[in-house]
Every structure is written in C-alpha cells, then in structure tokens.
Regions:
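Active-site-adjacent helix/loop patches that line small-molecule binding or acyl-intermediate pockets
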Residues: 1-21, 76-182, 190, 198
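Cyclic nucleotide-binding regulatory module and flanking cytosolic helices
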Residues: 5-6, 416-465, 502, 512, ...
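Active-site SXXK
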Residues: 48, 61-83, 195, 263
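Glycine- and acidic-residue-biased ligand/ion/polar-headgroup-sensing regions
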Residues: 67, 463, 472-491, 502-506
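Structured C-terminal helix/loop/strand segments within mature extracytoplasmic catalytic/sensor domains
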Residues: 202-233, 238-311, 332
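Cyclic-nucleotide recognition modules
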Residues: 263, 497-554
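STAS-typified acidic loop motif
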Residues: 312-354, 368-372
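Amphipathic alpha-helical interaction surfaces in cytosolic regulatory modules
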Residues: 342-406
Length: 576
C-alpha cells in the first residue's frame, strides 16, 4: 500500500520534474556528462523510516556536501583546534573565492584548511567516517577525482595562499589532492537522506543505530550549515526555508530538520549560486507545505502516540452479554485504538500513519482529545488513511471533514462502535423470561414465584432518568430490555460515561448494599423495561425466605465484584 508520505513525494516529484531550468556544472569536465533530467528525492526519519521517489539510487559525487562531514570528523578528532583555526562566519562570496581568511568550513578556503587538520589518510579513515554517516560502505569515483584534479587551479591557488600565510603545515598540492578525494566520494540520493537524518538525530545513524558524532559536534555543524551551507544564498535560504542545508555542484542537496528527519535531493542542473534548482525547490516546498521551518518549533515533543491498545486489552464502558464479551476477548486484537497527543505536524503525522499502516488490526480508532494543535500537513497525511480508520474521537472539524470515519465526542463511544463492528452486536436483546436474569440465577421455581410477587414493573422512555446522582437508593432495578447509560459529572462540568447497561444487568446494587446515595445518573438511551425490587422487600426476605435472600445477595456481590474489577482495569490503564 502506498503511504500518504509516499503519495505526497510522488506528486511533488512529478510536478518539479517539469522544471528544466538551470545548467549542469561543466568546470569539471566529467560533471558535464550528467543527465539533466535525473531527479530523485529521499526522506529519512530519525526513527529509520525512508521514503524515496525518482532516481534515488543513481550514484553521483558528493562534492561540497562532504564539507560538513569533514568538519564533523575534524571536530571529533581535533576538538577546539578546529574552531581556533577555521571561522564560522558567512562570506557573501562565491564558494571557490580565492581568500586568505577561511571564514567558515563550507567554502573552499575553510574546507581545505579543515581537511589539512586531519592530516594524511593512508588507511582511508575519512572514507570510513563518511560511510558511517551514510550507513553503508562508500567508494571513490576515480574518473571524477582525476578530472577535478586536472582543473583544480583555483583550489591550488587557495591552498598555496593559506600555506604561504602559515595557516597549515605540509605540501599545499597534497592537501588539495586530499580535498579532491573527499569531493569524489560516490553517494546516491538515499545516502544523502540518511546522512541528513544522522545529523537530525544528533549524530546517531537511524539505520545502523551507530553513533558517529557527538551531539555537541552536530550542533556546531548544523549551526554553520544554517548560516553558510547554501553559498551566497544562505541568508535568503535561512529566512525562507529555515533548515540547515548543504549543496554540491554535482546536483546534490541535503537539508536537516533537527530531531525529525533528513532530506536528500539529486538533480544536476544548477542555479546562478551553484545550487540544484530542483533541490532548492523541493526543500522550499517541503518546508512551506509541511511546516518544517526550524524556528517555528522550539523543540520536538514526546511521541505523538501516547498509548495504543486493542479491544482485547481494554473495552468500552458498555457491559455486554457474556457470550458477546467472550467474543470481544477472543477477537479484540482485530480492533486497535491510538491515543494521540501534543502538536501534530508533518513529522508527528508521519509517525502516526506508519504506526497505523503497520498494525494488522481491521478496525482502527484515532483519539485526538489530547492533541493541542494539528497542522494542515498533518491533516493531509492523516486523510490518506481514510480507508484504514473506522472511527475518530474528539477530532477537530477540519480533520473529520476529510475522513470517512465515524466521529465521536469521546473515546469510549468510539470503542463501543468498534465492538459493534467486531461482533455485530448492535441491538439490545430483550430477555424472554425474568428467570433468565443473572440476579435470579440459582433460585427455584417456587422462589421465583415468590419473588415475582414482590417485583414492580417499570417502563422508561428514551431520555428518562431512572436514578439521579445524590438520591437515596430504595430499590434494585433489573433491566429486561433497552439500554441505560450511567454517567458522572466531573469537576470540570463535563459528563463522563462510566457504564452502559443492557438487558440482564442491574442498576443500584452498590448503593443498595452499602446504603449510600447514588454518585451518578442513570438515564435511558432507548425505551427501557425493568423490574424493581424494593429495599424493604429484600430486607423482609430475611424472615420470609432466608435462603432466597442469601442467593440474591450472593449474585449481587458477584455483580459488584465484576464491576469493581472493571473499575480497577480503567484505573490501571489511565482511562479518564
């Protein structure tokens, strides 16, 4: 099944593929051979989900996207020395400007100096470091390396200028060759997304689980990427897109949504600043439509899924016939609830959609009563689950409008709906005989005849109150048909259902046994018939028929115990 995120990316790719503006870099002869129609987009989340569309497995050279990785590796191995030698200021100049002052590690002067700090690399440790970020073994494209080496006049000039000023020791031409090697590492679009996601995850690769950089190092790298990663367009980029990013002249772009996901794009045609035209547009659209600008979100909150459970673990407050209850216990795994929380943006909705699509449950309810805000991007993603969601609880109108799911004001009603779907139990069965009522289980025919003489028949229309909160309870009601809901009023003034009762159940047993007043209302949802056993009649049985009274009290205690067990379950699972 195509996920909502995948559908979104496929639509984005199809639209932006029509943009044929820009030119392929040709100052390195081998780069000029790239197909301008090549185009791939990949997203990788910090919990290892990866989405791809287009030419995501087409290899190309990493070029300047290597710079933040080398900066990270230098910070890890050389520490404060790097900050003392290389600045972090934006330049406002071309990336390959011949400059003595290495203002930041993402322009060539700073990148060459940063590379020099790592020293010679005979055993390929730099490549292994890049591979750790990508989550797989990377290779070097010797054709690109040789082609770039033949035309690296500006980089050699920069290196000699830096060496002449005493900025590093060693041979300047050798440093340039080392720098060219790092730019010639082969990656694909998926690699870029994983690299970006590793930075988004604070230095832990979400695919391999390996930590490749410390959170402090990642903080420093992302800070420079945010202010200098897109060459002399970095200021506009940070203002408009608001994501740390880095581009390369082979057509790659990475962008990082801290704490959430990484973006990788490949498309060779470049704009006047040397950035991939389609790559820039992809990041712009993702940032705007998915609300990813990093300064709009101070931090990532807790998991958007507060809790999830099946009907085998927790049912609604509706009390069922024993046979139906047993069916729910057996088949409850076919229905699952997801309680959501916090602010739902794109990243949070992506987690929710993935969780829903991964569950084997046939019936699903989303409960949104703890969701503070829901962004349009989250609504769009969740709408893609329309055929998987059976019910919504406390959903905002804008979400309910785009879903075909049955809406409910509270989760308990939604759970009852799922139970009905699961079992087909939508009607309230009427008892054929009063003798079938569980309260009368185990009594003889003679005792039943005696008891029928004490019972009073009652009828209630839908909406009538059978009992009110605070009233003294003077009788036990035995329901023989219809549906009754018991509710309590919370301190907030909200009314919460605590039980829904049907034929074969009782009302007032606890208050009758304890002598206390009612703590909630009992109201007829449908027409209700019941039989009332007055409290004084029950007390009089002590002298009239002590055995019958003992049976009735035993049955009532079993009912109270069963309801108490359900109350404990609710408390254990924090249902409120």
């Amino acid at each position: 099944m195509t996920t909502p995120v995948q559908s979104y990316l496929e639509d984005l790719h199809a639209r932006l593929a029509q943009d044929d503006s820009g030119t392929v870099a040709d100052y390195i002869p081998e780069l000029a051979l790239a197909d301008p129609s090549s185009f791939g987009i990949a997203l990788a989340t910090v919990d290892s989900a990866i989405y791809e569309v287009g030419d995501t497995r087409l290899p190309f050279t990493i070029q300047s996207i290597s710079k933040p990785l080398t900066f990270a590796l230098a910070l890890e191995s050389r520490g404060e020395m790097v900050r003392e030698r290389v600045g972090v200021e934006p330049t406002g100049e071309a990336f390959n400007a011949i400059a003595l002052d290495p203002l930041n590690p993402l322009v060539n002067a700073g990148a060459i100096l940063t590379r020099s700090l790592l020293g010679p690399d005979p055993d390929g440790s730099l490549l292994r470091g890049y591979s750790a970020f990508a989550g797989r073994d990377l290779l070097i494209d010797d054709r690109i390396r040789e082609s770039e080496s033949r035309t690296a006049y500006r980089n050699r000039a920069i290196s000699h200028l830096l060496r002449g000023a005493g900025r590093f020791a060693g041979e300047p031409d050798e440093i340039v060759e080392d720098y060219i090697v790092q730019c010639s590492v082969l990656v694909d679009c998926r690699d870029l997304a994983v690299i970006a996601a590793t930075l988004a995850a604070g230095g832990r690769n979400p695919v391999t689980g390996r930590r490749v950089a410390s959170p402090d190092t990642v903080r420093d790298v992302l800070s420079v990427m945010a202010t200098a990663g897109m060459y002399d367009a970095a200021g506009d980029w940070l203002y408009d897109v608001g994501l740390p990013a880095k581009s390369g002249v082979a057509g790659g772009v990475i962008a990082v949504v801290p704490g959430q996901l990484g973006i990788g794009v490949f498309s060779p045609p470049l704009d006047d600043q040397g950035n991939s035209v389609r790559g820039v547009r992809v990041c712009e659209e993702l940032s705007h439509s998915l609300d990813l600008h990093m300064f709009k979100h101070a931090h990532r909150g807790p998991s958007p899924v507060r809790r999830t459970f099946t009907l085998a673990e927790l049912t609604s407050k509706r009390q069922r016939d024993p046979a139906v209850a047993a069916q729910i216990a057996r088949e409850g795994a076919r229905a699952r609830a997801f309680e959501l929380q916090g602010d739902l943006g794109f990243a949070e909705a992506e987690q929710v959609t993935r969780a829903v699509l991964e569950t084997p449950a046939e019936f699903v309810v989303l409960d949104l009563r703890r969701v503070r805000n829901i962004h349009e991007s989250a609504i769009a993603l969740l709408a893609g689950l329309a055929d998987r969601i059976s019910a919504l609880s406390a959903a905002p109108r804008e979400l309910a409008r785009v879903m075909s799911a049955q809406p409910f004001d509270e989760l308990d009603r939604a759970l009852e709906f799922l139970e009905d779907r699961l079992t087909g139990d939508t009607a309230a069965p009427a008892l054929v005989r009063l003798a079938d009522h569980p309260v009368l289980r185990g009594i003889s025919a003679d005792d039943l005849a005696l008891l029928e003489g004490l019972l009073e028949h009652r009828f209630f229309a839908a909406g009538d109150y059978l009992l009110r909160a605070g009233e003294a309870v003077g009788e036990l009601l035995l329901i023989t048909s219809g549906v009754v809901s018991e509710t309590v009023e919370l301190a907030s003034g909200d009314v919460r259902r605590v039980a829904t009762l049907t034929a074969g159940m009782t009302i007032g047993e606890l208050a009758l046994l304890t002598g206390g007043p009612r703590i909630g209302d009992a109201r007829a949802d449908t027409e209700v018939e019941c039989h009332a056993l007055p409290a004084d009649a029950l007390a009089g049985l002590h002298e009239l028929d002590a055995h019958l009274r003992a049976i009735l009290l035993r049955n009532l205690l079993e009912i109270v115990a069963a309801r108490s067990a359900r109350t404990r379950q609710d408390l254990t699972t924090l249902v409120d």
